[in-house]
Swiss-Prot record:
One of its GO terms (biological process) is translation. It comes from Pseudomonas aeruginosa (strain ATCC 15692 / DSM 22644 / CIP 104116 / JCM 14847 / LMG 12228 / 1C / PRS 101 / PAO1). Part of the 50S ribosomal subunit. Contacts protein L32. The keyword Repeat does not apply. This is Large ribosomal subunit protein bL17. The gene is rplQ.
Length: 129
């Protein structure tokens, strides 16, 4: 029985899930808007929002924790230099999930995941399929 077990499996092993959400978080921080399936978008929120909260206080220890979770120097740099300052006065709720219809091939529900208060403009990046 799976009583009180949180999170979605998404038909993947735990290592595959961890790598996928790590990559999706890095893409989100880099582009600030990505398109993915709705269940992945909802799970991505559980990965990305704590990283932004971590970036609100800039310290070597926090940078190392963020690097451990993203494995991307560029993402850590943007988190602490840009996003942490942008959301310094916001107590959570850094992501917005917008439903955007269904994928043509398998009719999967799709969604945009974007950072709130982002500068408007730019292209949409397709996330992990």
């Amino acid at each position: 029985m799976r009583h009180r077990k949180s999170g979605r499996h998404l038909s993947r092993t735990s290592a595959h899930r961890k790598a996928m959400f790590q990559n999706m978080a890095v893409s989100l921080f880099e582009h600030e808007l990505i398109k993915t399936t709705l269940p992945k978008a909802k799970e991505l929120r559980r990965v990305a929002e704590p990283l932004i909260t971590l970036a609100k206080e800039d310290s070597v220890a926090n940078r190392r924790l963020a690097f451990d979770r993203t494995r991307s120097k560029a993402a850590v740099g943007k988190l602490f230099n840009d996003l942490g300052k942008r959301y310094a006065n916001r107590p959570g709720g850094y992501l917005r999930i917008l439903k955007c219809g269904f994928r043509a091939g398998d009719n999967a529900p799709m969604a945009y995941v974007e950072l709130v208060d982002r500068p408007v403009g730019g292209e949409v990046v397709e996330a992990a399929e």
